[in-house]
């Protein structure tokens, strides 16, 4: 679970990187589709799945808006993300095993923000993204 220090670290780091959300989301989603090709099945309705394509860029931004929303609801992720959990469970039917983007977001943070993404920030962001994935999985139980 997230300590008070983790929450402070996540909020502080997010305030530094959120202005680059579109680029972070595009790169993270592009990487996910390459590294975890099985995730492409959820996006088969898109005309183009290549890294950096318009649909990938657009959905990457959507994902990062969700991450930003989660940062603002960090005190109670499960309640705060219930609507998003229901969407993924009942409408999109995404298997929680395919919530693979968080690892790619961490990679992109490390690449884009090498000075700011310290080991301490890495640990807190990893814990936060794991908590976010658990909150999104809530409606699958």
Swiss-Prot record:
A Pfam family that the UniProt record links to this protein: Globin
Binding site for heme b: 88
Domain (Globin) ranges: 1-141
Residues with PTM N-acetylserine: 1
GO biological process, one term: hydrogen peroxide catabolic process
Gene Ontology annotations for the cellular component aspect, listed alphabetically: blood microparticle; haptoglobin-hemoglobin complex; hemoglobin complex
InterPro entries associated with the record: Globin, Globin-like_sf, Globin/Proto, Hemoglobin_a-typ, Hemoglobin_oxygen_transport
PANTHER family, per database record: EMBRYONIC ALPHA GLOBIN E1-RELATED, HEMOGLOBIN FAMILY MEMBER
Anything else known: This fish has two hemoglobins: Hb1 and Hb2.
The protein, known as: Hemoglobin subunit alpha-2
Organism in which the protein naturally occurs: Notothenia angustata
Designated gene of the protein: hba2
